Amino acid sequence: MRPLVQLARHGVTFDRIPCSADGSLLIEKAEELLKPNTRLLVCLHASNVCGTIMPVQELGKFCKKHGLLFILDTAQTAGTVPIDMEALQLDALAFTGHKGLRGPQGTGGFLIRNELASQIEPLLSGGTGSVSHTEEVPSFLPDRFEPGTPNIPGILGLHAALCDLEQTD
């Protein structure tokens, strides 16, 4: 919620789909909240408070039906619950490396459909290891979204954790 609240300070409006007492999303209420300018639905995959897993399959269908982008926060589920971006009709997926993926703190990522990459402005800007002869941020992936020196020890640690998860499963 904090990123959405931060965006609201810059004029972005959002609504919250209500939940039941046990934390289950009341998906039927989503239809009532639609406005002509609704562009996307952002949802967590599972609650960090009560563990309720959200009905992401239904949300993906809802978003497709209404032409909305669908972003899923998998901080609580990545590495523990199978996630298929295509089957869930996700446009983007955020994950943290240090929870279910068992990687180091300070790691994580944001997966986006290729079609969206050119539509998103990088949050940060800085040097890259490629195209150093120009002052412009590279337009190709992944360099477009990698300003400055990456957290190489963290990335290697996350890679090792992912390899371990693959061997264990």
Feature-to-residue mapping (PLM):
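Pyridoxal 5′-phosphate
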Residues: M1-D169
